[in-house]
Each structure stands twice: as C-alpha cells, then as structure tokens.
C-alpha cells in the first residue's frame, strides 16, 4: 500500500499557474510601463478596427495589424522580464531563455500570417472593388503611426532589438540603404542619420503611413479606389519581407544550430585547447545557441595519466568561456591497462588450462574512486570511461569456457584448439622464433604443450 496523505496539497490549474506567474512579473516596477502600454494598445487597436469597418479600407486594416504586432512585442518583453526573474530548475537546467526565442518566433510568424490574409483579401477586392470612405482614413493612419513609433522608441525590447541586429537585412532595408547612400552623396551631413542600419520596425511604420497618405490623396482627388487595394498589398509585402528574416533567425536558434559567424572562432578555440599541456585529444564537441546572445556546449577531453584534472579543466573552461556561457566538460585519462590474470582455486573438473579460454573481466570500481568534479576515475588502474558507462557484466567474475571442439584424427595434432598464448609463444610455427619470444596479450600466458597430448596420452611422432 502506498503512503496515505491526509492533507494533500491541491494541484493548481493551468490558469492558476499563469496568474501566479503574472503576479510575479507585475510585482516588478519595470513591468508597469509595459503593462500601461499594453492597455493603451488594446484601446487604440479597438478604435482602429472600428475605423477600418467604417472606412471599408483594407489598407488601414493591414496597417492596424502592425499595431497588433506591437501588442505581441510587448508580451515578448514581459516574457523577457519573467525569464530574468526565474532561475533554472531541475527540469529546465538551462533556464528559460528559449521561451523568449519562442515568443519572437511566434510573433513574427503571426505577423506573416496576417500579411498573407491581407494578400488573399486584396486579391478578392481586385475582382470587385468596393467604395472607400476617407472620413477616418487619415485620422486612423496618424493615430496608428504615433502609437507604433512611441511604443518602439519608448520600450526597450531586448529580444526584438537583438534579432533585428543579428538577422539578415530585409529587402526594404536594402532599398532604403541604397537611397540613403545616394542622398548622403549629395548632402554629406545626413550620413549620421541615414547611413546606419535603420530599425526595421520604424521603417515599416513610416513606409506604411506613407502608402496610406498617398491612398488618401488619390481617393480624394480622383476617387481611385483601387489604390487602396494596391497599398494594402504593398504594406503586406513589406510586413512579410521584414518579419521573414527574423523568423528564420529565431527558428534556427530553436533548432539548436551554431551561428555561422562564431564557427571560425570556435574552431580556433578548440585548436588552442588541444595544444594545452596534458591534453591528448578533444572530441565530441557540440555547440548550439541557447538563447539570444548565449551559447551552450559540451566537449570531451582526453588527457595524460599524469596530468592534473583540475588544472586541465580550469584551462579548458577559461579558453572556451569567452564564447560559450554554458559549458559542460568531461575529462577522462588515457588509461589503457591489461586485464588481470585469473586468480583463485580452479574447479576439479577442469583438466588443463591450455584446453580452456580464460576471459578475465575487470571489476567495477566503487563510487569512492570517482572524482566528484569531473566524474573521472581517479586511480590509474580504472578502465577508460567510454567503456565504463552502462557496460553489462562488470560485476561478473572471470569466466572459464570449456573448449569442446576437436580436430580430426590422423594428423598428429591435438584435439583442442591451440591456445592463443601458445601460438604466439611458439612464434606461429615460424623457424627461428623460439618459445621465449612470446607476446603479451590479454589472455593467460600458460606454458604451451607443443608436442604433447595429455588427453589421449600419445606422444607426438
């Protein structure tokens, strides 16, 4: 029978756990500003959706989706604060840094799905273009632009700031960079403003507002309603082109890949580690991106028998810690030994050692012989670690197998196979190599019976 718990602790539901973590984040003063912007975002998004319905403008709807993306970015910022408050647990030993990577990936993918929805609706509108009312179009444009810029420039969103710098440039950034170089060639004083890489979120907000302003002007002047659909397609393409590089970068981080720009540096560090005093080999190295700007890795280092494990571990960690923040180093000594000979009494039914194969098995070392820091056998008589993990039969005593195979009669040979040690000690029948030139093997060096056969009692002719 199991243990009876009189006062069992009630299990929290998913929403209960979520509410508890939200209270943990809300207790931090740094999150109050984010929560305030989140409330304002919900209010602005509600008004913009009503104005989209009244104006019947799909271009304004596409621009409103950028405001919804700002709400996702604020949620990502809250998750980033929550990650800094939580410590690694036994279940999540590397911490919760990958959660903010997942939040960035989900936000960018949802923005791209919204852009695809706008493209689908725009394709339907090309067949039957409805009438656009410009009453709230310009007002909604400036409200969305001001709020988007104010949110992006006021809130320090570390995950999106890192991704926007680390990811490849979008086609919109490349075209704007070309225009900026041409403009700075005419007016050199603008180089400090336009030549640096522009924020992709600010750039798409400005470009979308510019497209809506052109839409408003053309509809007011010529009642050209098709320009609203064209502007919606342009905003959707700019949104997709801006979010795609970020989703690719965050997806690669989730797949635990190694960043291309650090592969050369890691190779250089591995070569430096392999030249350290006492290090014989560095193998099974694996490095991956744990979070934004943090690498994790594991490496196996084989050292000499007389090398100091703690010194080698300190030097290896010191070399790799410049790039790899979370590092696991497994050190084992180059300790190949000969198995011990059979010891103890032999059973009475064993006729002769030479008619049997003796397979000595190494004994399992106790836990007291292990180094608690590196999990490396401390004594030089221990087997190599790669042959010590989950090896069956380590606690089995030496096994003696009876050799019952016989050879045909009439050739003057023994009935049993010639022992491996006897063959080597006899020089494999090569003239000039006597019995004194035996080789060391992992089997017993029993004196050979060349020319005798005790089993049938007949001398060799």
Swiss-Prot record:
Residues 371-392 are annotated as: Disordered. Pfam families: Cation_efflux. Expressed in brain; especially in cerebellum, hippocampus, parahippocampal gyrus, superior and middle temporal gyrus. Also expressed in B-cells, colon, eye, and lung. Lower expression was present in bone, brain, cervix, ear, heart, kidney, muscle, nerve, pancreas, prostate, skin, stomach, and testis. It comes from the Eukaryota. Keywords: Antiport, Golgi apparatus, Ion transport, Membrane, Transmembrane, Transmembrane helix, Transport, Zinc, Zinc transport. Changing residue 205 to A: No effect on heterodimer formation with SLC30A5 and no effect on zinc transport. It is found in: Golgi apparatus, trans-Golgi network membrane. InterPro entries: Cation_efflux, Cation_efflux_TMD_sf, CDF_SLC30A. It is a multi-pass membrane protein. The keyword Protein biosynthesis does not apply. One of its GO terms (molecular function) is zinc ion transmembrane transporter activity. The chain crosses the membrane at residues 34-54, 65-85, 99-119, 135-155, 201-221, 224-244. Residues 55-64, 120-134, 222-223 are extracellular. GO terms for biological process: regulation of zinc ion transport; zinc ion import into Golgi lumen; zinc ion transport. One of its GO terms (cellular component) is Golgi apparatus. Residues 1-33, 86-98, 156-200, 245-461 are cytoplasmic. Has probably no intrinsic transporter activity but together with SLC30A5 forms a functional zinc ion:proton antiporter heterodimer, mediating zinc entry into the lumen of organelles along the secretory pathway. As part of that zinc ion:proton antiporter, contributes to zinc ion homeostasis within the early secretory pathway and regulates the activation and folding of enzymes like alkaline phosphatases and enzymes involved in phosphatidylinositol glycan anchor biosynthesis. PANTHER family: ZINC TRANSPORTER 6. Belongs to the cation diffusion facilitator (CDF) transporter (TC 2.A.4) family. SLC30A subfamily. Heterodimer with SLC30A5; form a functional zinc ion transmembrane transporter. This is Zinc transporter 6. It comes from Homo sapiens.
């Amino acid at each position: 029978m199991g243990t009876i718990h009189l006062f069992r602790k009630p299990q929290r539901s998913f929403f209960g756990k979520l509410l508890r973590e939200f209270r943990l984040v809300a207790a931090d003063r740094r999150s109050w500003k984010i929560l305030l912007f989140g409330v304002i975002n919900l209010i602005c998004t509600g008004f913009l959706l009503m104005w989209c319905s009244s104006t019947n403008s799909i271009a304004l709807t596409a621009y409103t989706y950028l405001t919804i993306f700002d709400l996702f970015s604020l949620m990502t910022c809250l998750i980033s604060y929550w990650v800094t408050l939580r410590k690694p647990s036994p279940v999540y030993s590397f911490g919760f840094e990958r959660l903010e990577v997942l939040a960035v990936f989900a936000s960018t993918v949802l923005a791209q799905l919204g852009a695809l929805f706008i493209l689908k609706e725009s394709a339907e509108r090309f067949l039957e273009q409805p009438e656009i009312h410009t009453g709230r179009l310009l007002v909604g444009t400036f409200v969305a632009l001001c709020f988007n810029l104010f949110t992006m420039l006021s809130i320090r969103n570390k995950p999106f700031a890192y991704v926007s710098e680390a990811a490849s440039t979008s086609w919109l950034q490349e075209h704007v960079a070309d225009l900026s170089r041409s403009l700075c060639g005419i007016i050199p004083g603008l180089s400090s403003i336009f030549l640096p890489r522009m924020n992709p979120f600010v750039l798409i907000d400005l470009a979308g507002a510019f497209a809506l302003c052109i839409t408003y002007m053309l509809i007011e002047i010529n009642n050209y309603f098709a320009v609203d659909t064209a502007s919606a397609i342009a905003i959707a393409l700019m949104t997709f082109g801006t979010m795609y590089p970020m989703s690719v970068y965050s997806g690669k981080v989730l797949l635990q890949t190694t960043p291309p720009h650090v592969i050369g540096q890691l190779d250089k560090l591995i070569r430096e580690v392999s030249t350290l005093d006492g290090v014989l080999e560095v193998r099974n190295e694996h490095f991956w991106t744990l979070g934004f700007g943090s690498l994790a890795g594991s490496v196996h280092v084989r050292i000499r028998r007389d090398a100091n494990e703690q010194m080698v571990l300190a030097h290896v960690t010191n070399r790799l810690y410049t790039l790899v923040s979370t590092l696991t180093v497994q050190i084992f000594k180059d300790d190949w030994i000969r198995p011990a000979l059979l010891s103890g009494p032999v059973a009475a039914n064993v006729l002769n050692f030479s008619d049997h194969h003796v397979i000595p098995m190494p004994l399992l070392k106790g836990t007291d012989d292990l180094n608690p820091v590196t999990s490396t056998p401390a004594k030089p008589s221990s087997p190599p670690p790669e042959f010590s993990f989950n090896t069956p039969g380590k606690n089995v005593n030496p096994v003696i197998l009876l050799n019952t195979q016989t050879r045909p009669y009439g050739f003057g040979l023994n009935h049993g196979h010639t022992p491996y040690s006897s063959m080597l000690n006899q020089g494999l029948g090569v003239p000039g190599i006597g019995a004194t030139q035996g080789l060391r093997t992992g089997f017993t060096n029993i004196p050979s019976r060349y020319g005798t056969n005790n089993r049938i009692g007949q001398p060799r002719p």
